Amino acid sequence: IHYSNPHIIVGCVPVFEGKVLLCKRAIEPRKGFWTLPAGFMENGETTLQGATRETWEEAKARVTNVDLYRIFDVPYISQVYMFYRCDLDDGEHSAGPESLETQLYAEADIPWDNIAFQVVSETLKEYFSDAAAGHFPVRVSAIDHRAKRS
């Protein structure tokens, strides 16, 4: 028997002084576009461990106060995304091998037209809305269609 199971992508929404840390992708897909630090979960780790590992690998960033924030089911590509909201420990970050650069962004400065993936755009919009409201519910939803890309 052979099973083909979905892939789990884990990542963080690292925040420092009201700004969110983004990474400019150095690899395909969507090379040169901005994303949250995230990647495929590895065998033998929890989703939390995977999210913090990916944040270190892609942005050389240490995080604390890590809480589950967003889950997306993306059945048309057999993926599940899990993002954790967290604090960027000391504000320090730098590009890892899968990132061209890293940068902290206030909401008004985010390069919205250059965000790599729909799940990242939606997560960022929800984060800033939730931050303004002072309440961070865990959200679960599905994206069951391909977004149009320019």
What do the PLM-derived regions correspond to, one by one?
Residues 8-10, 30-32, 64, 80-82:
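A generic structural signal for short beta-strands and their flanking turns/coil linkers
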